[in-house]
């Protein structure tokens, strides 16, 4: 259902730039699951896109100290010098990328970074190449900014990764950006240096195309996978690459709302113009906390990633043991993206035929009280996403319920 359909009854006519944007399937499922919980039903919600760990104590203490120092006023528009220096050092230390402070921007979450970049660069009809499955906001942000999302299906047969052949075929004179996310939400797929190389070679041939990389799940990778970011791999693309990151996932700071990016000075300046007329500066207290996160101890990241890996293994093994489901092993993030084509056309105990991944997920919620998200919400069917950012006990119970639900299909 689109925005137009939901608000016209109230006599309000939405702007055309948002009229085609639908209400998030994730939000609808979450609302239904929450309502069922309020009714006393034992719902297990596996849709959360945030870590279940707490923000580290030293980060919380830094925020408290900032408050007591009176650092509760406006800051510089796109980030304090202290935070920009911490980000610069992080990029150099962990990614081998060198940026000046005026090539770094800070915003109220990585989502605002993406919005600022698209708003600052897209003219009506400009195209943005987005591999599917994709994080749901990518396409909507492009549309709000009057760009045209070019969605390229990348299913399990390609490891949910874009290929050079598909990228080359998608590029036109109107292409402005290619958007890549590694590790990916929702698939958990990640690009190695070898995976990136053919894509970067394609981009080198098309100097009018810029690259936006979302590295938010950088620190959550498994099985000795070596994370790498494209601007390091190909210096020839650095002057048209925006490298996006944030503190939300690695440091369990989703509610602190700090995202950041490094990129060409002219783009960063244009993004600041957009931000100046939107939110102005990010939260001063959150910025102080983020300095502590980036500059402070990082050893806890390994322990948390090991915990996520145990859960990943539990979920992947459990799903692959269920007839009709097929789950690829993700390289990172905290999601599985399982195929469910094997249950298509089967019939539920109530007599409803499963025609889509949306039907399957609705069945799991209503029949077994397990909330997962259909692949259609991420632009690729028939799949469903599970977030394993919850306890192993809850994951085991959810897998038992999903298995039992599949056995009841005829």
From Swiss-Prot:
Cofactors demanded by this protein: pyridoxal 5'-phosphate
Substrates-to-products reaction catalysed: L-aspartate + 2-oxoglutarate = oxaloacetate + L-glutamate
Documented EC number(s): 2.6.1.1
Chief location of this protein within or outside the cell: cytoplasm
Description of the deletion phenotype: Insertion mutant is prototroph and is able to carry out symbiotic nitrogen fixation.
Disulfide bonds: none
GO cellular component: cytoplasm
The protein's name: Aspartate aminotransferase
Function: Catalyzes the reversible conversion of aspartate and 2-oxoglutarate to glutamate and oxaloacetate.
Coiled coil (residue ranges): none
Entry keywords, A to Z: Aminotransferase, Cytoplasm, Pyridoxal phosphate, Transferase
Homology family: Belongs to the class-I pyridoxal-phosphate-dependent aminotransferase family.
Assembly notes: Homodimer.
pH curve summary: Optimum pH is 8.0-8.5.
Subcellular compartments: Cytoplasm
Annotated binding of L-aspartate, by residue: 47, 135, 185, 385
PROSITE patterns membership: AA_TRANSFER_CLASS_1
UniProt GO molecular function: L-aspartate:2-oxoglutarate aminotransferase activity; pyridoxal phosphate binding
GO process terms (BP): amino acid metabolic process; biosynthetic process
Annotated positions of the N6-(pyridoxal phosphate)lysine modification: 249
């Amino acid at each position: 259902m689109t925005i137009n359909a939901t608000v016209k009854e109230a006599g309000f006519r939405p702007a055309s730039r948002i009229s085609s944007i639908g209400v998030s399937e994730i939000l609808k499922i979450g609302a239904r699951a929450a309502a069922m919980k309020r009714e006393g039903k034992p719902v297990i919600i596996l849709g959360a896109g945030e870590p279940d760990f707490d923000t580290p104590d030293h980060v919380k203490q830094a925020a408290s100290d900032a408050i007591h120092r009176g650092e509760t006023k406006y800051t510089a528009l796109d980030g304090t010098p202290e935070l920009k220096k911490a980000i610069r050092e992080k990029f150099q230390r962990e990614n081998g990328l060198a940026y000046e402070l005026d090539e770094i921007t800070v915003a109220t979450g990585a989502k605002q970074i993406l919005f600022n970049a698209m708003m600052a660069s897209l003219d009506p009809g400009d195209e943005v190449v987005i591999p599917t499955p994709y994080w749901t906001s990518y396409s909507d942000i492009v549309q709000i900014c009057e760009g045209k999302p070019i969605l390229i299906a990348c299913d399990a047969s390609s490891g949910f990764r874009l290929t050079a052949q598909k990228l080359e075929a998608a590029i036109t004179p109107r292409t402005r950006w290619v958007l890549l996310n590694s590790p990916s939400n929702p698939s958990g797929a990640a690009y190695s240096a070898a995976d990136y190389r053919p894509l970067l070679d394609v981009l080198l041939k098309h100097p009018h195309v810029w690259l936006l990389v979302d590295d938010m799940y950088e620190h959550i990778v498994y099985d000795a996978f070596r994370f790498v970011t494209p601007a390091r791999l190909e210096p020839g693309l650095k002057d048209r690459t925006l490298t996006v990151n944030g503190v939300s996932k690695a440091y369990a700071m989703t509610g602190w709302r700090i995202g950041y990016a490094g990129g060409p000075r002219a783009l960063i300046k244009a993004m600041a113009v957009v931000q100046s007329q939107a939110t102005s500066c990010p939260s001063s207290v959150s910025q102080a906390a983020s300095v502590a996160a980036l500059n402070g101890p990082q050893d806890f990241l390994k322990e948390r990633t090991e915990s996520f890996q145990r859960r990943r293994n539990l979920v992947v093994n459990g799903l692959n043991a269920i007839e009709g489901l097929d789950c690829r092993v993700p390289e990172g993030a905290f999601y599985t993206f399982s195929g469910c084509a094997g249950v298509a056309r089967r019939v539920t105990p109530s007599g409803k035929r499963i025609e889509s991944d949306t039907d399957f997920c609705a069945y799991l919620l209503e029949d077994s009280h397990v909330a997962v998200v259909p692949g259609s919400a991420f632009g690729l069917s028939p799949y469903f996403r599970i977030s394993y950012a919850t306890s192993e006990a809850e994951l085991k119970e959810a897998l038992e319920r999903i298995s039992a639900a599949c056995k009841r299909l005829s």
